[in-house]
């Protein structure tokens, strides 16, 4: 879906993100657009199911994966109507840096952003929330 790439480009334009993606979570459960070569490009339907699933506690204990990358859930407000976001942090494997990730939920898509090293999760959360709200208000 080439039209969705412009949304990813918009999320990336201020330089604080290393990756962004728009991912369908309803009937078209796959990555619609993502930063080329990134982890988000490989997000699977099973990983989407964990994020949107009914079990809102298990991932706090067990973590989750995004494109095969292990992550910890910091805060889950994905189904809180006034918020619709989730804050995640990648886990270090082999000593590499960890990164903040924010997810925003619109009506049919999830917005993913991953910050560069040292980028605070609060700014990423606001970015994911704003894009998800825009898409929700636009019928997505």
UniProtKB/Swiss-Prot annotation:
Belongs to the profilin family. This is Profilin-2. It is found in: Cytoplasm, Cytoskeleton. Gene3D superfamilies: Dynein light chain 2a, cytoplasmic. Its main location: cytoplasm. One of its GO terms (cellular component) is Schaffer collateral - CA1 synapse. SMART domains: PROF. It comes from Rattus norvegicus. It comes from the Eukaryota. The gene is Pfn2. GO terms for biological process: modification of postsynaptic actin cytoskeleton; modulation of chemical synaptic transmission; negative regulation of actin filament polymerization; negative regulation of epithelial cell migration; negative regulation of ruffle assembly; positive regulation of actin filament bundle assembly; positive regulation of actin filament polymerization; positive regulation of stress fiber assembly. Binds to actin and affects the structure of the cytoskeleton. At high concentrations, profilin prevents the polymerization of actin, whereas it enhances it at low concentrations. By binding to PIP2, it inhibits the formation of IP3 and DG.
